[in-house]
């Protein structure tokens, strides 16, 4: 066994030194100044501490994976460093002030702060990376947050079988930057209020890139209204394509197989007893326009039908096993490519995991639904929604001599909005 050398030093060692980079990035944004303009009632605690200091403090906590208000007490051990690193002007607030101030901040600065974040991205020359085919992926999905054994407002049974919330999130680029999210009660169906979320997401994405977008959705969002939104965007030459896994509903797998068996041009035999049919057809979709006029269009439908008569172990089936996968798309990409691109949509699960585990935001800190919206996202229709959080993955580029240092930082930026979106800096 090697000997362990212990050295004594007078140097000051600081564990969360990466907060310095977060403070530098926030310093380029005007959102703190705009937040400070919100009036503070004389009835609130520590009113001499500005709203910007409150938000900057909480940002520092979240960057360390500590979303609970009480974690701010750890900063009191070295207040000078945290004030310097995060740009806090007056003092670090108490846990009580954090909780109270979150409930106080309104939504009047929503547009201003959204624009401030977009401007910050532009100043940092950020553009989400596209796929090899030129499309910038936008993955949208619902991910339940487990808040079991709690009496928090809005907590209810999710489709995962536990009590919690069901926020919807949108990631852009191959990096998986979180561009938009919205907190929802656990029992809410994933399609409810999604059309408005899609429109807002497209608008936010368009401020980050002019490249063609490829939006990917699960079968829970197989709805004509969603398809109509994407088609109308494509008609406006907005370069919006989509892949949505179809919900077969009452469609018969046997009828699908019989309809493609004779006409399919791409038939594969991976092994004995297994046949895969891949191809395309067109199905009509009717959706309503903004003036309530109905419009019917033929949408390209990709199919992947697998017929198994023998399992992998050589056992014969009495009745063939049929697996059906169909996908809506308006892209002109090859059939195989469309299927592979949808399967890559599953990578967004790892982004969910970063938020819920690495960042420890899955179990929200407050018992109030509105207060938890401060931390994650807010519903447009919630009249007294307060401050919310942008969760992003930041890459801060530093040029020194002729070297480039890329430092990836899990970064949180607050917004006062009804809906939350997240930005990423590269």
Question: Model-flagged regions — what are they?
Answer:
Residues 385-426:
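A short, flexible helix-boundary coil/loop motif
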Residues 19-24, 53-65, 329, 376-390, ...:
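Short, hydrophobic/amphipathic alpha-helical patches that form generic packing surfaces
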Residues 188-251:
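Domain-level cores of phosphate- or acyl-group-handling catalytic modules
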Residues 57, 72, 89, 94, ...:
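Short, conserved catalytic/metal-binding motifs centered on acidic residues
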Residues 39-46, 335-342, 359-374, 390-399:
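Short, solvent-exposed helix-loop connector elements
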Residues 1-163, 169-189, 194-208, 233-236, ...:
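Dynamic "connector" segments at or just before major functional cores
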Residues 1-3, 34-38, 78-82, 317-323, ...:
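Short acidic (Asp/Glu) and glycine-rich catalytic loops that position anionic groups and cofactors
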Residues 2, 241-357:
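An anionic, glycine-rich sequence signature occurring as long contiguous blocks
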